[in-house]
């Protein structure tokens, strides 16, 4: 069960401006996502996350969808995708998302007051997306966030550091001198 670690060590690195960025099947959809890697990740999430009495898995589009779908299939917990497109459905809640890379609006549908949710995403980097989602779910919708999981955490400060939100991760990494460095192979609890 070391596919995630090895896949990160093998990940190609690209440069975007002054930023070194790893390209990984979980966070980018390329290179190809092998089923054994996805299976390992879902098993590790099931072992780490608080799933008892969770009503819904909530994930932002787009790169949380494949992980959350696999988790939903394994746990029979319904999946809600926070979309980047507004549909105008009853109960739709907009949220403003700002990361180190972009700004946009996202829209929550099918999460109601009192719902107990697991929030799941592929990567925790600046924390902007995750913080906006958690704030909207708790403050605007009135959902109870039972647990929060990000598969990969990029080392460094993020917007959740000084909040009450606890994000569990499966592995923590950084990029140094054109290579992925494993900071914590077990992630955060």
From Swiss-Prot:
Read off the InterPro entries from this record: HGPRTase-like, PRibTrfase_dom, PRTase-like, Pur/Pyrimidine_PRTase
Q: Does the record's keyword annotation contain Cytoplasm?
A: no
- In terms of superkingdom, the source organism counts as Archaea
Q: Which GO terms describe its biological process?
A: purine ribonucleoside salvage
Pfam name, any one: Pribosyltran
Cite the GO molecular-function annotations of the record: transferase activity
Q: What is its EC number?
A: 2.4.2.-
Q: What class of enzyme is it?
A: transferase
Alphabetic keyword roster = Purine salvage, Transferase
What exactly does this protein do? May catalyze a purine salvage reaction, the substrate is unknown.
What family classification does the UniProt entry report for this protein?
A: Belongs to the purine/pyrimidine phosphoribosyltransferase family. Archaeal HPRT subfamily.
In terms of PANTHER family, this protein maps to:
HYPOXANTHINE/GUANINE PHOSPHORIBOSYLTRANSFERASE, XANTHINE PHOSPHORIBOSYLTRANSFERASE
The protein, known as: HGPRTase-like protein
